[in-house]
Amino acid sequence: MQLLTLGINHHTAPLSLREKVAFPLEQLKPALGTLRQHLPHRKSTAEAAILSTCNRTELYCATDGNLPEDTAHEHAIRWLAHHHNIDAGELAPHVYALGQSQAVRHAFRVASGLDSMVLGETQILGQMKDAVRTATEAGALGTYLNQLFQRTFAVAKEVRGTTEIGAHSVSMAAAAVRLAQRIFESIAEQRVLFIGAGEMIELCATHFAAQKPRETVVANRTLERGEKLAEALSNQGLNARAVRLAELPARLGEFDIVVSCTASTLPIIGLGAVERAIKQRRHRPMFMVDLAVPRDIEPEVARLSDVFLYTVDDLGAIVREGNALRQAAVAQAEAIIETRVQNFMHWLDARSVVPIIRDLHAHAEALRQGELERAQRMLARGDDPALVLEALSQALTKKFLHGPTHALNHAQGEGREQLIDLLPGLFRQSSHSER
């Protein structure tokens, strides 16, 4: 069985490419179906899961396709490029393709927060669990990926429970507040707009709430969900309310700070809307953070002199400031992961002989059943039971030994020597187990 992991992330690809290969939630299940069909396979259907976040898009696959690892990865790259209507040549230089133990190690590191922009962050573990849940609902997981992800989650729990990998961590939300404080002397005097109402916006809202902004507004496509977040902020003593997303173009200029993170596949805020907002504000500065992938705010907005626009990649330098303090924890985590990778590979190696063992049992059962029926016929016609048992045992012995003796008689050269060394050990093992 081949394990494959293929993807791009913030280490290998710019935001402009990552947003092209992001998967909206509603596309994941159909995409899993076409991916599994595209992967090479023989007897069993390929298994697959897709992890898509603001910092990475990764395909986790298991296939029994008897192809070289490079060929299997080429199939996956072509599928990813075709699915998103981009040229495979544009994508390939930024893709990492990992097989077997490397794929396992990568999954363990990602879930443990070792591969994140925010070292040790916990959000990625929840995102990976969501990806597995979606793949399960789509019927895309089987024995191998199920086992991989169950062990992945166990390793992540062990790493976080026995090391300080999450200590001194600066989240993306906290980094957004720090950047805003560089622009405005006091956030308490500013009006803040949050676009979206998902987990990332909730985290950002919580961090900004600690600064007690003058006014907080939540704009969301679904007003009810925006009102729920606004109510939670009001309960923290803030002046908070919700508006519909459609109201943004006319009201954007009211806000000093804008934080956006939606699942939209197209920009929500265009250059023209921001230009009008700046004129309305009489060129007072506007701080904007776009945490969405694909982006919610057109990148051309960054060229406006009165706008300070930051993306997830721009926040990277700030969130990495505490990384040096966690290097000892990283070393501990890597040691744990390496041990668990070896454990998983032992399990995988053991699984590789399961089909052979199953076939051996099926063959032996067929021989046993055939001779048993023959013996029952002999007894039915009145043959001596002792002679029937003798005939049964002799027939079973001959048939069980036919395959090994035939192979030994017809083997030549090195193959014959290997059989001579192997067969006695197999039969000794069998006799030991009988005792």
From Swiss-Prot:
Assembly and oligomerization: Homodimer.
Extra information: During catalysis, the active site Cys acts as a nucleophile attacking the alpha-carbonyl group of tRNA-bound glutamate with the formation of a thioester intermediate between enzyme and glutamate, and the concomitant release of tRNA(Glu). The thioester intermediate is finally reduced by direct hydride transfer from NADPH, to form the product GSA.
GO aspect biological process, one term: protoporphyrinogen IX biosynthetic process from glutamate
Keyword entries, A-Z: NADP, Oxidoreductase, Porphyrin biosynthesis
GO molecular-function terms, A-Z: glutamyl-tRNA reductase activity; NADP binding
Coiled coil: none
Name assigned to this protein: Glutamyl-tRNA reductase
Site keyed Important for activity: positions: H106
UniProt binding sites for substrate: T53, C54, N55, R56, S116, E121, T122, Q123, Q127
InterPro entries: 4pyrrol_synth_GluRdtase, 4pyrrol_synth_GluRdtase_dimer, 4pyrrol_synth_GluRdtase_N, GluRdtase_CS, GluRdtase_dimer_dom_sf, GluRdtase_N_sf, NAD(P)-bd_dom_sf, Shikm_DH/Glu-tRNA_Rdtase
Binding site for NADP(+): G196, A197, G198, E199, M200, I201
Organism this protein belongs to: Ralstonia nicotianae (strain ATCC BAA-1114 / GMI1000)
